[in-house]
Each structure stands twice: as C-alpha cells, then as structure tokens.
Amino acid sequence: MYDNKQLQEISTQVRRDILRMVCSAKSGHPGGSMSSTDILTTLYFNVMKQDPATWTRDGKGQDMFILSAGHMTPVYYSVLARAGYFPVSELASFRQFGARLQGHPSIRKGLPGIFQASGSLGQGLSAACGLALGKKLYKDDNFVFCLCGDGESE
C-alpha cells in the first residue's frame, strides 16, 4: 500500500511519461490521459488486487481493468509500466510502426496487463459487465474496473 505522497510521486512520473510519449510520437491524446492519471495510479497501486508476475489474460483470481476510452493509452501504458508489467523504457516506442504500444490498447501484440482491446467508444462498459458476470458465475470474488469515456455517457 502506498501513502499519498508516494502516489503523488508516481502520478508525477506518469504525467511526465505521457508528455514524453505524445511529444515524441507527435501523435496522441494527452488531455484524457492527464486527467485520468490519479485514477489509474490509485487503482493500480492502492486498490486493485493484481500482480504482474502472476498476470494471466483470463483474469482468474485477480482484479481486471478495462480502458473503454481507448485513446487514453498514454496513461494506461505508463501506469502498466510503472506497476511492472513491462519495462518503462518501452514507453519510448509509443505509436511507432511495429511497436506493441499503439494508439489503442490491443491484445494481439501480447502486451501484459491488457484484458480487452478498445477503440470504439462505448464498448468497454459492456465488455466490463460481461467480464464481471463471468467472474460471478465462476465464483471469482475479484473486481472488474472500467474507466468510461464519453461513449458510455451520451
């Protein structure tokens, strides 16, 4: 468990990562990423039951996170890297041809920590509901978290 000062320090690192990634790629959506930094930092470092060392794509025995607003990948990738899912140095490859870190999260590139591809706004919440129902049916008492965007709100 991290205290508030540690969470603030991680959030500051994540915000720096976001700016570096978007500026280096000359592409991306920094606004949503910057505004959701504290949410994802708190989830991954103080709320969610997750461990990069034991992570599995099926989500059994762990909390799951779905980023419905898929264009906010800079914050998602930075938090995943800072939580230990892949090296922080890989953030430099954001949106480069052939890289795992593209503009929307994808499960095809084998990036650990991502349970659901997203991109079409409005699909993440329904996917998260389905994953939560699956957890309930299989008696997995872990949680599914979803960061919704304007697609679910309109």
Regions found by a protein language model. Give the residues of each.
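Cofactor-binding active-site loop characterized by glycine-rich and histidine/acidic residues
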Residues: 18-21, 33-154
